[in-house]
Amino acid sequence: MTFTEETRAVVDAYYQAGAEGHLPSFGTYLDERFSVTAPNYLPWGGTHVGADFFREQVLEHLTETLDFSRFSYESFTVERTHAVALINIGVVGTDDIIKISEHWEVRDGKAKSIWVAYFEPQPLLKLLAIVVSGN
């Protein structure tokens, strides 16, 4: 398997685990020094190093806010150990779909990091009861 194929398989396993209703099972793909960086305004935001944080705070709870049954790829680009998934995903309890750009690094069959950016996240912020100034 090439680096690109391996990276594609690991990253796709995350989204498929969510879509199939067993997101926590993705924890087996995490390197123990896995790092996640997400916008600070989210409960799971900031930069966190260590697979335990992602397993306990993200994999165990993300489906409380994001509806993976309404997941789709806008685009999925992989080159060697780097993947960028631009996804559409539902916001739980609403008809809203938001767009998220997720940038992954994978090596030796393990996810090493994810960096996440949300586009127009107002429906998610409303669900989380986070007040946003502006429009």
Language model features with spans:
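C-terminal and inter-domain tail/linker signature
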Residues: 1-135
